């Protein structure tokens, strides 16, 4: 544990995470000040009036007067004012680093371009089913520091590349980079810089769980995991066995469960299940808990979720597909009886969409593109139409639907150009799906 008493600490960014940092540091008797570049930041009304607050810009003087800066993951350490503070010898960390210095129980840490929320939630359910008190948080749900208020046996953290940039003391019992595909290219110089941020999760961990099908998830010499295990369809420690047309989840030579006994569907979710099993076993979670969770965990909202079905048409909400890799995962191995009506669009975050081209140029796939980067996506397929909004796209495709068709929202883009969040986008899709059937 670190002594923060009397230290001058500036927290950048309010919201749930920023407030959790303020609460933690004030309880440790630090002298806390808060900066938020928004003029009216979320959470300002919850901040104790005795805490100095500067809004609308980064206050360079406050930063230079600090012993430590706790930076919001949404702000890059490359920002000029932060670089000036670093050059002056000010320590810059994130909330996850504060958590790691304090946590006394084992941590399972999960990152990746796609699937990390599903795996985080599934591992959490495995631990709970085994009788453990599990704290789940980080980039999903509860801020990590808030988890310290409970007496948990195990922490399961979803971590973003942004959070990992300023995390140095993780020392996870088990950690994984599920996959690495282009995302946040408006923040990183290239894919390798993004990957290196992800790989920080392996520093000093006991077991690194790597994706045997994605060499970018393998630790470099810079990391120092005590041991490494892999998951993949074949030739891995955790793998899929096919026998008499059925697929089985395997841990080395031991059969865990048939894939048709788990609630998660699709090849990408079978990979997620293998990763979760590997992490859980590395952390000593009992097999009984692992099996129970696999049989009962239904998946997360907005992750390839059946939003509605009527007249033989399935409406599938995959609004969480905020990057190309996630949409590729949704489309790979997808089998439908009729036509696939694919909704694409939003803020592409500077990504290269070309990986989608081969997947969507099929006679049974029709693309309906919308939003900020809709025009770029529409160029990928000869069977594309361009719209301003998702609602306009759905109005157009509705009369063409026939039994056996699927309408899939898997946009390959962030939502913030037109929606408050990917959740709001998914909710609007679900509303329109049900309205579409009602009409």
From Swiss-Prot:
Location, primary (coarse class): cytoplasm
Catalytic activities: UDP-N-acetyl-alpha-D-muramoyl-L-alanine + D-glutamate + ATP = UDP-N-acetyl-alpha-D-muramoyl-L-alanyl-D-glutamate + ADP + phosphate + H(+)
Pfam families for the chain: Mur_ligase_C, Mur_ligase_M, MurD-like_N
Molecular function terms from GO: ATP binding; UDP-N-acetylmuramoylalanine-D-glutamate ligase activity
Alphabetically ordered keywords of this record: ATP-binding, Cell cycle, Cell division, Cell shape, Cell wall biogenesis/degradation, Cytoplasm, Ligase, Nucleotide-binding, Peptidoglycan synthesis
Compartment(s): Cytoplasm
Annotated pathway: Cell wall biogenesis; peptidoglycan biosynthesis
E.C. number(s) listed in UniProt: 6.3.2.9
A GO biological process held by the record: cell wall organization
GO CC, alphabetical: cytoplasm
Domain of life, per lineage: Bacteria
Residues where ATP binds: 112-118
Database matches in InterPro entries: Mur-like_cat_sf (IPR036565), Mur_ligase_C (IPR004101), Mur_ligase_C_dom_sf (IPR036615), Mur_ligase_cen (IPR013221), MurD (IPR005762)
Matching Gene3D superfamilies: Mur ligase, C-terminal domain, Mur-like, catalytic domain, NAD(P)-binding Rossmann-like Domain
Presence of the UniProt keyword Cell cycle in the record: yes
Keyword Secreted in record: no
Function comment: Cell wall formation. Catalyzes the addition of glutamate to the nucleotide precursor UDP-N-acetylmuramoyl-L-alanine (UMA).
Family from the record: Belongs to the MurCDEF family.
Name of the molecule in the record: UDP-N-acetylmuramoylalanine--D-glutamate ligase
Originating species: Mannheimia succiniciproducens (strain KCTC 0769BP / MBEL55E)
Lineage, opening ranks: Bacteria, Pseudomonadati, Pseudomonadota, Gammaproteobacteria, Pasteurellales
């Amino acid at each position: 544990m670190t002594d923060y008493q009397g230290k001058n600490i500036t927290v950048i960014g309010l919201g749930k995470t920023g407030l959790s940092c303020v609460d933690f540091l004030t309880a440790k008797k630090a002298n806390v000040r808060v900066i938020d570049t928004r003029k009216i930041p979320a959470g300002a009304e919850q901040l104790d009036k005795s805490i100095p607050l500067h809004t609308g810009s980064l206050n360079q003087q406050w930063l230079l007067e600090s012993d430590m800066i706790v930076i919001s993951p949404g702000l890059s350490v490359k920002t000029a004012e932060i670089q000036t503070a670093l050059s002056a010898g000010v320590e810059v960390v994130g909330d996850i680093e504060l958590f790691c210095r304090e946590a006394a129980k084992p941590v399972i840490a999960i990152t990746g371009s796609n699937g990390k929320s599903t795996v985080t939630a599934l591992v959490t359910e495995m631990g709970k089913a085994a009788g453990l008190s599990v704290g789940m948080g980080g980039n999903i749900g509860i801020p990590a520091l808030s988890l310290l208020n409970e007496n948990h046996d195990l922490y399961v953290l979803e971590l973003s590349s942004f959070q990992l940039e300023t995390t140095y003391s993780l020392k996870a019992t088990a950690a994984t980079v599920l996959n690495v595909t282009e995302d946040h290219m408006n923040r990183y110089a290239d894919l390798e810089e993004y990957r290196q941020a992800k790989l920080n999760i392996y520093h000093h961990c006991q077991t690194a769980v790597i994706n045997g099908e994605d060499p970018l998830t393998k630790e470099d010499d810079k990391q120092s995991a005590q041991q490494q295990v892999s998951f993949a369809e074949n030739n891995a420690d955790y793998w899929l066995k096919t026998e008499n047309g059925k697929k089985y989840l395997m841990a080395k030579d031991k059969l865990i469960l048939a894939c048709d006994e788990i609630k998660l569907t699709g090849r990408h979710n079978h990979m997620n299940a293998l990763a979760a099993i590997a992490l859980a076993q590395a952390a000593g979670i009992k097999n009984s808990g692992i099996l129970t969770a696999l049989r009962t965990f239904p998946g997360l909202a907005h992750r390839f979720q059946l939003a509605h079905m009527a007249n033989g048409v399935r409406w599938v909400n995959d609004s969480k597909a905020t990057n190309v890799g996630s949409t590729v995962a949704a489309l790979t191995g997808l089998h439908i009886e009729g036509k696939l009506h694919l909704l694409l669009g939003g803020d592409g975050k500077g990504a290269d969409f070309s990986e989608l081209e081969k997947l969507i140029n099929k006679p049974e796939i029709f693309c309906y593109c919308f939003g900020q980067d809709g025009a770029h996506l529409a160029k990928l397929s000869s069977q594309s139409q361009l719209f301003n909004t998702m609602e306009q796209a759905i109005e157009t495709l509705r009369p063409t639907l026939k039994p056996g068709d699927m309408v899939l929202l898997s946009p390959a883009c962030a939502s913030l150009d037109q929606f408050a969040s990917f959740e709001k986008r998914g909710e609007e899709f679900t509303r329109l799906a049900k309205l579409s059937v009602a009409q």
